[in-house]
């Protein structure tokens, strides 16, 4: 089965189109390896012959491909009336007539002036898929979206290449250090840095942060691999993101490398590290002391997160969800 993950309208220019070869990504314009990482890319490795398309590169003509399934996320300017024909589901279907198009809900916060065309895009698709593992499936916003669709929302977990991350970054010997993780959006940073520095000073533990450039936490200047090499040796990972509308992809990686996450309200925080999935600093400090003083407790927490990771987030798990949806249409 040939699958393409496609994005239109919002994706960074860093997300170049590529094709899968083995476990690597290669740009269409040559044999240059592409190293940008996002879990949605893992759909392209479900079967041989997968690829990723950034439609901004193909506004004039789509590439000649033999596709069976298209996972399509259309957002932002791709939903504007002036750009509709370039980013419509109909254009994909005309070029790839045998392919089933899956409308992928990459974000659930859509501006009001684009909402109508976003629903139109989802209704034009053959299926609708939203990435959610547990409690996010019950968010009121999904009930609202479902009421406007002509087909049901299918909930998948996000596929993570657990084996590759483990091989590259896992270690059972960790530095007794805290990594203070900051998402790029300011409103999602909460009191992560302040709390990390408080705990670090009180318990004499090194606090590590991503280097800032020009006062910004811009992710563009550091590769994903370099960034992971920076934080993965730390035993403690602090991320007090207060949003309950986010999946929390980063904390999935935290569980994958054998570190322990503290704080935050994203879905993966609750699934993988339920005892510390809060922004209540008194609870977090109490748990930190408990874990700090008990190797047995740390092992229990890391083992629980590892088992949940493999149960819910593996590539084969999500591939099975996709096949079940396609076979039961």
Feature annotation, model-predicted:
Residues 2-8, 25, 35-144:
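Extended catalytic core of nucleotide-activated donor transferases of GT-like folds
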Residues 31-35, 292-327:
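A charged, aromatic-enriched C-terminal amphipathic alpha-helix characteristic of glycosyltransferases
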Residues 275-299:
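C-terminal "capping" alpha-helix adjacent to the active site of nucleotide-linked donor transferases
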């Amino acid at each position: 089965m040939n699958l393409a993950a496609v994005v239109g309208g919002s994706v960074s220019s860093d997300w170049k189109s590529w094709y899968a070869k083995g476990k690597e990504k290669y740009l269409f314009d040559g044999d240059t390896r592409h190293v940008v990482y996002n879990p949605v890319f893992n759909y392209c490795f479900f079967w041989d012959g997968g690829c990723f398309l950034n439609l901004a590169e193909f506004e004039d003509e789509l590439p000649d491909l033999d596709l069976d399934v298209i996972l399509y996320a259309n957002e932002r300017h791709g939903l504007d009336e002036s750009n509709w024909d370039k980013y419509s589901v109909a254009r994909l279907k005309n070029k790839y007539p045998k392919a089933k198009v899956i409308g992928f809900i990459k974000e659930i916060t859509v501006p009001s002036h684009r909402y109508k065309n976003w629903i139109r895009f989802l209704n034009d698709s053959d299926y609708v898929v939203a990435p959610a593992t547990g409690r996010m499936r019950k968010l009121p916003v999904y009930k609202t979206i479902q009421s406007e669709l002509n087909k049901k929302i299918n909930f998948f977990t996000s596929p993570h290449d657990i084996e590759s991350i483990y091989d590259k970054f896992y270690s059972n010997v960790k530095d007794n250090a805290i990594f203070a993780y900051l998402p790029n959006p300011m409103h999602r940073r909460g009191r992560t840095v302040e709390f990390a520095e408080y705990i670090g000073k009180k318990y004499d533990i090194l606090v590590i942060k991503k280097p800032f450039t020009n006062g910004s936490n811009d992710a563009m200047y550091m590769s994903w691999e370099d960034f992971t090499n920076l934080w993965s040796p730390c035993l403690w990972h602090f991320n007090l993101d207060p949003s309950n509308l986010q999946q929390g992809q980063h904390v999935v990686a935290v569980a994958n490398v054998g570190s322990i996450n503290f704080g935050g309200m994203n879905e993966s925080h609750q699934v993988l590290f339920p005892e510390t999935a809060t922004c209540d600093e008194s609870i977090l400090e109490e748990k930190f002391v408990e874990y700090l003083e008990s190797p047995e407790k740390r092992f229990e927490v890391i083992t629980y997160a590892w088992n949940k990771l493999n149960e819910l987030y593996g590539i084969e798990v999500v591939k099975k969800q996709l096949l079940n949806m396609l076979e039961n249409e």
